[in-house]
C-alpha cells in the first residue's frame, strides 16, 4: 500500500457549519456490499486529469493506475479537472450517507478563483444562488489564504497576470454536477482550481496528492 505523509505545513482539522436545508433527494444508492464481505473504506487524494473510475475506453488516466484495491467504488464524483479527496467503499449505505442531500453531509472545498470576491458575492454563495437546475442550498463560503499544505498542480493553472486570484473555502450540503464551479461563475468569479478537502468525517489529513490510505475502521 502506497502511503505518504506530509511532515510540514500540515492541514487544518475539518470544520463544518450546520445550515438549515429544506430540499431533500429521494435518490438511493444501488450498490450493496455482498453479504459477509467486510466494509472497506479507501481515501485517495486524486490528482488533476484523473477520472474518478477504474476503467476508461478512451485510455485516459483512471484510479486503476493508483489504487490496487478491488470491489470499491467512489462515493460521489470528483471531476477529471478537480483534485483532492475521493472516498471509495464497497458499502452502499456509507455511499448514500456521504452523497445524498437529505443526509446533510458537509463537503469542504478549497477553491482558487479569478479575482477577489466581494462580501456581496460571499453572501450570495452563503444564501444560495439560482442556477439553471434550480436554487442551491445555503452553503459555507469564506475568503481564506492559500492553503499552506497546497501541492503544485501539473500542469499549472492558466491565469491572467493582470487579474489577481484568491482562495475560497466552500462547504456544500448537496452535490450537483460541477456545482462549485457554476456557483463561483454565477457570482462573477470563475474557478481556476478546485480541491475537495473533506467529506463528512473523512478528510485529506496530510495525505499527499496521488496517494491513498486504508481508512477502514
Curated annotation (Swiss-Prot):
GO MF terms, alphabetically ordered: 23S rRNA pseudouridine(2457) synthase activity; RNA binding
Keyword terms, alphabetized: Isomerase, rRNA processing
UniProt-annotated catalytic positions: 79
S-S pairs: none
Reactions catalysed, as given in the entry: uridine(2457) in 23S rRNA = pseudouridine(2457) in 23S rRNA
EC number annotated for this UniProt entry: 5.4.99.20
Keyword Isomerase among UniProt keywords: yes
One of the protein's GO biological processes: pseudouridine synthesis
InterPro entries according to UniProt: PsdUridine_s_RsuA/RluB/E/F_cat, PsdUridine_synth_cat_dom_sf, PsdUridine_synth_RsuA/RluA, PsdUridine_synth_RsuA/RluB/E/F, PsdUridine_synth_RsuA/RluB_CS, RsuA_PseudoU_synthase, TruA/RsuA/RluB/E/F_N
Function according to Swiss-Prot or TrEMBL: Responsible for synthesis of pseudouridine from uracil-2457 in 23S ribosomal RNA.
Family: Belongs to the pseudouridine synthase RsuA family.
PANTHER family assigned to the protein according to its UniProt record, in alphabetical order: PSEUDOURIDINE SYNTHASE FAMILY PROTEIN-RELATED (PTHR47683), RNA-BINDING S4 DOMAIN-CONTAINING PROTEIN (PTHR47683:SF2)
Name of this protein: Ribosomal large subunit pseudouridine synthase E
